[in-house]
């Protein structure tokens, strides 16, 4: 027997072991999906459906991915006010905040300052990642008010074969409400600490001829923390490291969704402004002129035709 044969056997055993270990892990993750639903729900209840995993609607127990679904009822029950609050409650996600943007990582990995470029964010299937850094910030500056979210579908793992770039850690698809979910007008007003104020007015309706509409306008203003201490700037020339009244934030958002038959027209106008107290990018410390501003406008026309229960064509 050649001396190299035991080495070949060892390599072969390692390869076979890795293959079966991968199968066990995959089967375990799939089993976790089913175990999250109790036996009575599997037998008698409605098993949730998901679209994002394969780009057609299927039961979560049939989807080839690890999926979490957060509904509007859960968002209201737990008092989430931003999409970042939702992600912070999900297993495998971690979030951080640098007084300018919020960041999220997955599976213990998150590069500071990468603007969440490894997660693909969708709103009703429309790509939200911007075209400069390919990033997205799911906090107060998100394009849709959280009260207009019907559910959030979170698909873990790479999905670049379906969605292209950014879908490395996962895909987050925000499904918005429809006119039938409101059936009239809604007015919401809230206030909180740090002189924070938030308001929203929405109108939704589904008419007898099948036409459906949802219109909404919302705004948010906050003064933030009035005094923040940074030891790195503890010097008389830098106000002894104290940033005063430079942590404010405000957001304005308009959203419209019209649908008739297989056609859906949706549009967004959003602008977000944030004071930056950390003097990032070598700017002046404790200077109210240091600000971040971003805006987004998009109009999306979608035609969706369902040929069968597993074949959906969208354009």
Predicted regions and their residues:
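Extracytoplasmic beta-strand/coil segments of soluble accessory domains associated
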Residues: 47, 52, 59, 84-127
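Periplasmic-side early beta-strands and strand-to-turn transitions of outer-membrane beta-barrels
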Residues: 161, 181-182, 190, 202-290
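N-terminal Sec signal peptide and the immediately downstream disordered periplasmic leader
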Residues: 2-5, 9-10, 15-78, 84-88, ...
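Face-selective signature of the C-terminal outer-membrane beta-barrel domain
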Residues: 257-273, 293-315
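Short acidic/polar hinge/loop motifs at secondary-structure boundaries
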Residues: 127-156
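Transmembrane beta-barrel domains of outer membrane proteins
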Residues: 86, 155, 175, 200-204, ...
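N-terminal periplasmic accessory domains that precede
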Residues: 83-86, 104-108, 119-124, 139-142, ...
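Membrane-embedded beta-strand positions in outer-membrane beta-barrel channels/transporters
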Residues: 103-105, 151, 171, 186-188, ...
């Amino acid at each position: 027997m050649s001396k190299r044969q035991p080495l070949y056997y060892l390599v072969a055993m390692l390869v076979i072991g890795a293959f079966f270990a991968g199968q066990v892990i995959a089967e375990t993750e799939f089993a976790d999906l089913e175990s999250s639903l109790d036996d009575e729900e599997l037998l008698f209840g409605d098993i949730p459906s998901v679209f994002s995993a394969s780009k057609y609607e299927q039961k979560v127990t049939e989807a080839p991915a690890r999926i979490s679904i957060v509904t509007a009822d859960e968002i209201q029950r737990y008092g989430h006010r931003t999409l970042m609050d939702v992600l912070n409650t999900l297993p495998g996600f971690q979030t951080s905040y640098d007084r300018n943007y919020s960041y999220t990582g997955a599976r213990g990995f998150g590069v500071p300052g990468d603007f969440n470029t490894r997660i693909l964010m969708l709103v009703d299937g429309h790509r939200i990642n911007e075209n400069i850094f390919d990033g997205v910030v799911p906090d107060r500056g998100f394009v849709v008010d959280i009260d207009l979210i019907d559910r959030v579908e979170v698909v873990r793992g790479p999905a670049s074969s379906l969605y292209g770039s950014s879908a490395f850690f996962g895909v987050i698809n925000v499904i918005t409400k429809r006119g039938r979910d409101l059936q009239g007008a809604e007015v919401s007003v809230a206030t909180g600490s740090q002189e924070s104020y938030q308001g929203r007015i929405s109108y939704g309706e589904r008419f007898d001829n099948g036409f459906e509409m949802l219109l909404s306008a919302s705004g948010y203003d906050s003064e933030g923390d009035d005094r923040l201490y940074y030891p790195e700037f503890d010097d008389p020339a830098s106000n002894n490291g104290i940033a005063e009244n430079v942590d404010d934030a405000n957001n304005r958002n308009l959203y419209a969704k019209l649908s008739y038959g297989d056609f859906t027209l949706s549009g967004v106008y959003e602008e977000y402004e944030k004071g930056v107290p950390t003097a990032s990018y070598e700017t002046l410390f404790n200077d109210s002129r240091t600000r971040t501003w971003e805006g987004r406008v998009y109009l999306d026309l979608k035609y969706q035709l369902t040929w069968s229960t597993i074949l959906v064509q969208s354009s």
